[in-house]
Design a protein with these regions (language model features):
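Structural recognition of the conserved hydrophobic beta-strand(s) that form the central parallel beta-sheet
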Residues: 16-24
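C-terminal regions of RecA-like/P-loop NTPase motor modules
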Residues: 3-15, 27-132
């Protein structure tokens, strides 16, 4: 995996193009906001080659009450994740595990499966009462 990623990285640099890839996460009980490179089923060494690594996992609707989000990274007020009446809508946590260009936030996305529309809602975190 690392060898293939290195070859693709060299091609991207040489031709000034973006190359994106999707890798499977392990089946685990890790909370979406706590994802790390160890939750990837592929070779962990692939991270060394990547410029950016985003780990994305669906948030279980039964656990929406454990999370809150805001439009600013350090906010005074946070919003609840509102369950959608639309059965095609899902919420996803995106943990930026590596970013050579800057910050590594944890973001909340809303996905409409019917239209494949991803909407970034803001910065996601566990509510204070659910922190270890």
């Amino acid at each position: 995996m690392k060898k293939t990623a290195t070859i693709l990285s060299n091609i991207a640099q040489k031709y000034h193009v973006f190359i994106g890839s999707s890798l499977q996460l392990l089946e685990s009980s890790t909370l979406p906001v706590n994802l790390t490179i160890n939750d990837m089923s592929a070779s962990k060494t692939v991270k060394e080659v990547l410029d950016t690594l985003c780990l994305i996992k669906q948030i279980n609707p039964h656990t929406y009450n454990k999370y809150e989000y805001s439009e600013e990274e350090l906010a005074e007020e946070y919003k609840e994740i509102e369950p959608s009446k639309n059965p095609d809508v899902r919420y996803y946590a995106c943990v930026v595990d590596k970013n050579r260009a800057g910050a590594k936030p944890t973001l909340l996305f809303r996905l409409n499966l019917a239209y494949n529309i991803w909407e970034e809602l803001g910065y996601l975190r566990l509510k204070q009462e659910f922190l270890d």
